[in-house]
């Protein structure tokens, strides 16, 4: 049996699992600067209340090439229904119109899915989606302690463009954030 990774627009049935993933990072890490868990309603707003060219995707694992007995076993296995591995967002970088060709990237995975290459595949996918939506620049802002995300963005050509010192406080410690950016679109009038 093989599995494939799919990126599909987030749907209502994904929201509960997505809020669980996000709230793990809220409660146990400095990856998120929220200090209180989000409610389902708050997460729905983040996922669905987006201007048209911003979007959210669920990262889904699907099983392939099953024989009939395996298909029956999978269909009755409640664990299979939980095939959502994480989610990706393209959101507004800033709320002013001149920023409309720039998007901020967010990638969250279930904690047990880190280090498996899923984040890399998600980043490649979201860059392609961003190009199709006409974005020129992608920005990723992460806690400076989040070295795995920093390595991911650097590996894919993102350049550090900002470092803000001690702008957050969580778990009784001051936290820095760093921003990375990547030009993905053509510059009208410059690139032809």
Give short role names for the model-derived ranges.
Residues 130-142:
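Conserved GNAT acetyl-CoA-binding A-motif
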Residues 108-109, 115-132, 150-155:
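Conserved acetyl-CoA-binding loop-helix of GNAT-fold acetyltransferases
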Residues 114, 140-150:
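Conserved beta-strand-loop-alpha-helix junction that forms the acyl-donor binding cleft
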Residues 89-92, 97, 139-142, 154, ...:
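Conserved catalytic-core motifs of GNAT/GCN5-like acyltransferases
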Residues 35-112, 123, 183-185:
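Acetyl-CoA-dependent GNAT
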Residues 5-18:
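A short beta-loop-alpha structural element at the N-terminal edge
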